[in-house]
A protein has these predicted regions:
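Non-cytosolic beta-sandwich-type ligand-binding/adhesion modules
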Residues: 98, 160-166, 328-338, 346, ...
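Extracellular and analogous surface-interaction loops
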Residues: 69, 74-75, 240-241, 265, ...
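Bacterial N-terminal signal peptides
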Residues: 11-17
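Aromatic, loop-rich ligand-recognition surfaces of beta-strand-rich domains
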Residues: 473-537, 561-610
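Predominantly extracellular/luminal regions of secreted and cell-surface proteins
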Residues: 262-268, 435-472
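Bacterial N-terminal signal peptides that target proteins for export
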Residues: 1-9
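C-terminal motif of bacterial Sec signal peptides marking the signal peptidase cleavage site
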Residues: 19-22
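Beta-rich carbohydrate-recognition and catalytic domains
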Residues: 24-128, 134-236, 241-298, 312-315, ...
Length: 610
């Protein structure tokens, strides 16, 4: 057949139209105008991306111990926004707000005490850590839980509670002088000159009544846990409301022994002391375990940063282990049938380590821990901090966000168990949350087929929502449940929709393994319905994969995970996509070809559309 040229006006780009060969039927082909997110400004470490569609976990907001809350108070001017709090200084806490969980606008100090001559200022003197905030509709108040070290006191990491009418603050310490009692039985209101008494002045602002908490600890056999203090010293508070009952709970981490504790709250200012419970102990799979039995916690004395997530009638505790200064700081998960447990830490075969920098495998991220988990637009996300310096770790950290998916695994008894799986930590380009970009991943709506599938593999892995990430942590779980679609050679993957869909971008995620990775996408074809009602196949040849960004050295030694070849374009109406990929050559990726089981593998395909 003869080829013919036709000119189309498409986004001010000349389009070439060809007559298709085969089947005796003419078909219009239009070369597509697109952007692949791989353009670099001079001297830039990161490519320029369309931030209306995508994000990347760059260093945007320096903050440690992030807590993110949704503003659900309809009276508030920021209703529908998200607020971010964290460890930001000695005497107070800065906060930010966002509409997309990625781009944060500074609001100001939610809590700040500069005058150290006042009791409040002295109480919040140094080492103000890990604020968490919650809104209470009944009281119409926002409450902040945190710890700080009082001025001129022998005690450190004192737990405090503050309140505000707004998530932006100002939060003010709540004064309990009329109701609290010192551990020696003296009511605080009866202590003379309490404002200048360095042993007592700060106790009026504490989260817990000193005497009642002391008695609760004694009941648990923990009266002598801290020989250096007569009041509880604690950090990393987490207020939580059970969605099924409306009951309130408060979790925290003891500064001695690093136990995670939990208790029921009658209100956010009135604990139910008799419910105080040990939730987790470093190294022990359950609080009642007779000896240490968690392999990945044998060399750590840290369990901290509790967060509770409900799912399927169970309660999931996420917590961090190891030193926050180390690359190995990571998030783990445990499960229970009740808010106060008993919680059982998941084994690595069950996915016990949720988020880890995997020091032997990652050169692009470090110290991923102290997380919040929230549901936004129907998708769960984990918000965590990572080190600013990958090489040195330390105290300087920034906020990052990745998706959480739920997968079903077999527990140690062979029973089905839902567990969290993190699509991260990532430093690669990822799609913005749907509620922010207005485009969702519709790939799972398509009927998927492919040529050249390797024995034992399946196209179902291409649209399961799970990004494959090379991990030593949870290695058995990842190898068992997080699958890539493997091919014995060149493949054409077809996604066929039951009707025309509005599509804005395509993401083809590479293999986690260098030996089965692709170098680029040979061709992508979109069967489209044009604005004038006619039909054409729009195509892209040689869609780039940003090999520069996703390899660790010039020798292409390590492939960074959850990375994709991306094409974004003006909206099209499309009912079928065909993606042709060929295995990389030794010249393109020198380590390619090590794997005898699969020459080529693809982790995931995402189609951003409506």
């Amino acid at each position: 057949m003869k080829k013919r040229l036709v000119t189309f006006g498409l986004a001010a780009v000349a389009a070439v139209t060809l007559l298709a060969a085969g089947c005796g039927e003419g078909k219009n082909y239009i070369k597509m105008s697109y952007y692949d997110e791989t353009s670099y400004e001079e001297g830039a470490n990161y490519s320029t991306i369309d931030e209306n569609l995508f994000y990347r976990n760059e260093r945007k907001v320096d903050v440690a111990d992030p807590c993110v809350v949704y503003v659900n108070d309809e009276k508030d001017a920021d209703y529908g926004s998200y607020y971010l709090y964290g460890t930001t200084g000695n005497t107070g806490f800065f906060c930010w707000k966002s509409d997309d969980l990625v781009n944060w606008e500074g609001v100001g100090y939610a809590l700040l005490y500069r005058d150290l001559s006042t009791p409040q200022g002295k109480a919040v003197s140094v080492d103000s850590w890990a604020p968490e905030v919650i809104y209470d509709g009944e009281a119409d108040k926002w409450y902040m839980f945190f710890s700080s070290t009082p001025k001129d006191s022998s005690n450190s990491y004192i737990p405090y509670i503050a309140q505000s009418d707004s998530p932006a603050g100002p939060f003010e310490l709540i004064d309990h002088i009329d109701s609290y009692t010192a551990t020696d039985g003296t009511p605080l209101k009866d202590i003379e000159n309490i404002e200048t008494n360095n042993s007592y002045y700060y106790q009026r602002y504490m989260t817990f009544d000193p005497l009642k908490m002391s008695q609760a600890l004694e009941k648990l056999g923990l009266a002598d846990m801290d020989a250096t203090s007569d009041v509880l010293r604690a950090i990393d508070f987490h207020p939580y409301v059970d969605s099924s009952t409306g009951d309130k709970y408060l979790y925290f981490n003891t500064s001695v022994n690093s136990y995670i504790m939990g208790m029921k709250m009658n209100s956010w200012t009135e604990p139910e002391y008799g419910t105080l419970t040990i939730i987790s102990k470093p190294g022990y799979s359950t609080p009642s375990a007779a000896e240490k039995d968690v392999p990945n916690e044998m060399n750590t004395s840290v369990n901290e940063a509790a967060w509770i997530t409900e799912h399927g009638g169970k309660y999931y505790l996420t917590y961090s282990t190891n030193s926050y200064k180390d690359k190995t700081y990571q998030v783990c998960q445990a499960v229970a049938d009740k808010p106060l447990g008993e919680f059982r830490k998941l084994t690595e075969a069950e996915g016990g380590i949720l988020l880890s920098a995997d020091s032997a495998l990652r050169d692009d991220v470090s110290g991923t821990g102290h997380s919040s988990i929230i549901n936004a637009g129907g998708q769960d996300y984990i918000i965590y901090h990572a080190h600013n310096s990958i090489a040195e770790g330390g105290s300087s950290r920034h906020v990052a966000v990745d998706e959480i998916e739920w997968i079903m695994v077999k527990d140690a008894q062979g029973n089905d168990l839902d567990v969290m799986y993190a699509n991260g930590p990532t430093t690669s380009v990822q799609p913005l949350p749907e509620f922010a970009s207005e485009y969702k991943n519709i790939a799972a709506q398509a009927e998927v087929s492919a040529t050249g599938i390797a024995d034992g593999s399946s196209v179902s892995f291409l649209t399961d929502g799970l990004l494959s990430i090379n991990r030593y942590a949870n290695y058995d779980m990842v190898e068992t449940y997080i699958k890539e679609t493997e091919f014995s050679g060149e493949t054409t993957i077809t996604l066929k929709f039951d009707d025309y869909k509005t599509i804005r971008a395509l993401m083809v995620y590479n293999s986690k393994n260098m030996e089965s990775a692709f170098y680029d996408i040979e061709r992508v074809e979109f069967d489209c319905r044009l604005e004038d009602g006619t039909f054409a196949t729009k195509y892209i040849d040689g869609l780039a994969y940003d090999i520069k960004a996703y390899t660790s050295t010039d020798d292409i030694d390590v492939l960074r995970p959850a990375s994709s070849a991306i094409a974004e374009f003006d909206e099209i109406e499309c009912n079928e996509i065909r993606i042709t990929i060929t295995p990389a050559t030794e010249e393109q990726i020198p380590v390619h070809g090590f794997n005898d089981l699969a020459i080529l593998a693809v982790s995931e395909i995402r189609v951003l559309g409506k």
